[in-house]
UniProtKB/Swiss-Prot annotation:
This is UPF0173 metal-dependent hydrolase Pden_0574. It comes from the Bacteria. One of its GO terms (molecular function) is hydrolase activity. Pfam families: Lactamase_B_2. The keyword Hydrolase applies. Gene3D superfamilies: Ribonuclease Z/Hydroxyacylglutathione hydrolase-like (3.60.15.10).
Amino acid sequence: MKLTWLGHSGFRLEIEQAVILIDPWLSGNPMFPEDRRDEAIQGATHILLTHGHGDHTGDTLSIARELKIPVVGIYDLINTWQTHQGIEGLGFNKGGTVDLGGAKVTMVNASHSSSFDGNEGPVYAGHESGYMIAGEGHVIYVSGDTDIMADMQWMGEYHQPDIGILCAGGHFTMDMDRAAWAARKYFDFKTVIPCHYKTFPLLAQDAEVLKAGLPGVQVIEPEVMQPIPL
């Protein structure tokens, strides 16, 4: 298994027989070196979206067309894009599980909002979501954009993820302190990786706060396009 941060909330996850691009915002992302785009998307088999906001959907449509790969996510958004954008898609909903190249991906709840820009303003894009991704002896919790929520209790007990990819930039999502509290209260992670931070001054956060709040947990500060040891 190999995980690479693409900046902001974007990741490239190589697991089982799948290469999954999660929330691939590359073009215009101040953290991502655009001359490494081809390297970032090479061999991708699926695109997995947590919600419809532009800093998460990003390059989804262009990559899906270029590589002829399916976009996976909440049914409402995927169905809209299949109808109006002509892409291949796999839409499902919370509680559902899909098999992506041998990795079992279950959609779970998040607490945020979800829309994309239309000609006359924001367009509803279905509910925001997170994911539990099981494969190669691990379960990875991808929080998507969220705050602390009570659902995390049963999500932790039922899915028992050992790796957490947690939004922690504050302002639009939980910050480092809240992410640490959620991880400590509801999960038993061995490894935690923060994301959705440092992209803009508004999202400036100190990962040392997360580390201090999670004694005994390996907290990895990701570097863009540097494989993360798991």
